[in-house]
Amino acid sequence: MNTKIKLLGLGLVASLTLVSCSDSFLEEKQNYEKFTPEIYNDFQGAQLRVNSIYGQCLPNPNSAGAWNNNCTGLASDMQSKATEEYTGISNDAATSFVDPRAELSSSTGFKVPDYFQNEQKHLANVWGRIRNINETMEGINGSTLSQADKDKLVGQCLFFRAWCYYQLVKWYGGVPIITEVQEPDPGSFTQRSSAKDCIEFIVKDLDDAADKLAAATTNGGWDSDNWGRVTSGTALALKGRVLVLWASPMFNRSNDQTRWQNAYEQIKNSIPVLNACG
């Protein structure tokens, strides 16, 4: 009996120790200040961080669209509904943000919907994703990886930062442009940029992404182990889509034909790159 009690006591001590270590481990991983930069000096470690960006930003093809999952074939495109051409004009609060007669404010109850759940301070909201992308790029650029490896990884990050801003601009127009990791200061403030500045920023990110990914993806695309990752062609295809949005009535009320021509030329020029990427 004494032997059984001793064994039971040792088992309890061991289990408590494991629980304590497990809790400590989880708490440490939740503290982003303890994320050591050495992880970026190893290609696999850096790639895991890039993979997490895919997980946060890619649409889910098996579910309806939501604030953290963009539109898929199974869901309506909520951001594209943010136009009077689609929704019409009414006194309904759900569509009042496209009604030029409605005063948008929290006091009237009519305001642009918080589609991306930013007010909920959720880590996976669109600004949390952008912060994660900026942090990952800073870590990779400051690492000891070869320039070729840096380009492969940073190129993917640039694409997803452009993707996040494309979704924001479709919904809100001009938004703050943030390219560096900011300290979590409640008093910090970043000025809102114009829609034009945002479009130019998105286009530059996509051009840079296409350049950085060219060596790895324009000779038939990624190898079989990396199938499905973004390529130079992916970046240029999104660039064409962004320029069509900029030329559309949503942002081009005067119907400036040069915007349409620019979008056409960019899409036309991207076709050889898309073919080269497989």
How does the language model describe each region?
Residues M1-N31:
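Bacterial Sec-dependent N-terminal signal peptides
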Residues D42-N51, G55-P61, G65, S90-Y172, ...:
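Conserved, well-structured interaction surfaces
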Residues N31-F35, T179-G187, D223-S224:
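Short linear capping/connector segments at secondary-structure termini
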Residues C21-S76, W260:
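Membrane-proximal, proline-rich intrinsically disordered regions
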Residues P37, S63-G88, I178, A214-T234, ...:
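Short, surface-exposed recognition loops and adjoining beta-strand edges that mediate ligand/DNA contacts
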Residues C164-V175, K239-F251:
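Extended, well-ordered alpha-helical segments in internal regulatory regions
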